Swiss-Prot record:
Function: Condensation of UDP-2,3-diacylglucosamine and 2,3-diacylglucosamine-1-phosphate to form lipid A disaccharide, a precursor of lipid A, a phosphorylated glycolipid that anchors the lipopolysaccharide to the outer membrane of the cell.
Name under which the protein is recorded: Lipid-A-disaccharide synthase
GO cellular component terms attached to this protein's record: membrane
GO biological process: lipid A biosynthetic process
Catalytic activity: a lipid X + a UDP-2-N,3-O-bis[(3R)-3-hydroxyacyl]-alpha-D-glucosamine = a lipid A disaccharide + UDP + H(+)
Entries under HAMAP family matching the protein: LpxB
Pathway connected to this protein: Bacterial outer membrane biogenesis; LPS lipid A biosynthesis
InterPro entries found in the cross-reference section: Glyco_trans_19
Enzyme Commission number(s) from the entry: 2.4.1.182
Highest taxon, organism lineage: Bacteria
Length: 383
């Protein structure tokens, strides 16, 4: 009787838990008795993953927090190394969390275990020399976007482009009016979605120029509605404070819901750069991108950056599809004229391009990831 397929897997945060869930489902569709062990969240555990530690152990953000938790993180890594070297899996998958997973992958690879890193770090954008560490730690990288694979190919590092899970999750056509009904927004009004970031540091720097841009838009379009996506109560309160200090005369509808629903309900979007820009492209809404970090971080990022663009739609297209304003340019003097241009345009060519790009990265990423891993360990795959 053949031994069941055994896969080691570690996810470090909620987004990784979702990726892990889809990956496990896709493997089990082909190998129902496959076993999964490592670290997972509630979704992975529900799919049968044996989690040796609580996923919260790895979910630390920021240098100070990481330093405070370093002894515990090192202990978790040592325990996982001991477990996997004593009970070698057929393959180990590290999902995102590169600071933790790449170190773990390197040690496991040195011990003869095949390793895969799922979700490429942004080596194509900055600190490209990290690719040599990734090469030393992995047998394969699974990349969401085609330009990521092109970058790895340049360095002869094994990588497969699997498409993006967001492109699978978001339908090709989204329903603006259904989203408005869901969020309780007036149907017959024009809405601008405002997304000033999900982290406190982002909102602190970006909310004010975004609100001041809305002030200028309101003068030109007095009937325009402004709807803000807040990821949690803290961000809601933070935005409200800045709004009342900056433009108390304006009306913002603040909604604690997914950014996706808020963007879908809108006619246009003013957003902070990040994955949300890709999501906006996938819901086919025209956008203007603004982003700001503190001056020192911005200076360092500029020195280490190797890409012309910051927002993913532009990086993916290899040209400027959407206007982006970074650092000092994240200011109403720049944001307002760009936003006016979007509001006064029918944007049909842009939406057409967004649709084409959506199709380009919609490949059933869960299944592609499973098949790539199965090929690596010489297992048959369902194509």
């Amino acid at each position: 009787m053949t031994k069941p397929l055994r896969i080691g897997i570690v996810a470090g945060e909620l987004s990784g838990d979702t990726l892990g869930e889809g990956f496990i489902k896709s493997i089990k569709a082909q190998y129902p008795d496959a076993e999964f062990v490592g670290i997972g969240g509630p979704k992975m555990i529900a799919q049968g993953c044996d989690s040796l530690f609580d996923m919260e152990e790895l979910a630390v953000m920021g240098l100070v927090e990481v330093l405070g938790r370093l002894p515990r993180l090192l202990k978790v890594k040592a325990e996982l190394v001991r477990y996997f070297t004593q009970n070698p899996p057929d393959v180990f998958i590290g999902i995102d969390a590169p600071d933790f997973n790449l170190r773990l992958e390197k040690t496991l690879k040195d011990n003869g275990i095949k390793t895969v890193h799922y979700v490429s770090p942004s080596v194509w954008a900055w600190r490209p020399k990290r690719i040599f560490k990734i090469d030393a730690a992995t047998d394969l990288v699974l990349a969401f976007l085609p330009f990521e694979k092109a970058f790895y190919d340049k360095y002869n590092v094994a990588c497969e482009f699997i498409g993006h899970t967001l492109a699978d999750a978001i339908p090709m056509e989204t329903d603006k009016f259904a989203a408005r009904e869901l969020l309780g927004l007036e149907q017959d009004r024009k809405w601008l979605a405002v997304l000033p970031g999900s982290r406190g540091g982002e909102v602190a720097l970006i909310a004010k120029p975004f609100i001041e841009t809305c002030q200028r838009i309101h003068k030109q379009h007095p009937d325009m509605g402004f709807v803000v996506a807040a990821v949690n109560e803290k961000r809601r309160e933070q935005f409200e404070t800045i709004w009342k200090e900056t433009a108390p005369e304006l009306d913002f509808v603040i909604i604690q819901d997914t950014a996706r629903n808020v963007m879908t309900a809108a006619d246009a979007v003013l957003l902070a750069s990040g994955t949300v820009a890709l999501e906006c492209m996938l819901v086919k809404r025209p956008m203007v991108v603004g982003y700001q970090v503190n001056k020192l971080t911005g200076w360092i990022a500029q020195k280490l950056s190797i890409t012309e663009f910051v927002s993913l739609p532009n990086v993916l297209a290899g040209k400027e599809l959407v206007q982006e304003f970074i650092q000092e340019e994240c200011h109403p003097d720049f944001l307002y004229p760009a936003m006016e241009k979007v509001l006064d345009n029918d944007n049909s060519e842009l939406i057409e391009k967004f649709t084409e790009m959506h199709q380009w990265i919609r490949k059933d990423a869960d299944k592609q990831a499973a098949n790539a891993v199965l090929r690596l360990i010489n297992k048959e795959t369902a194509e």
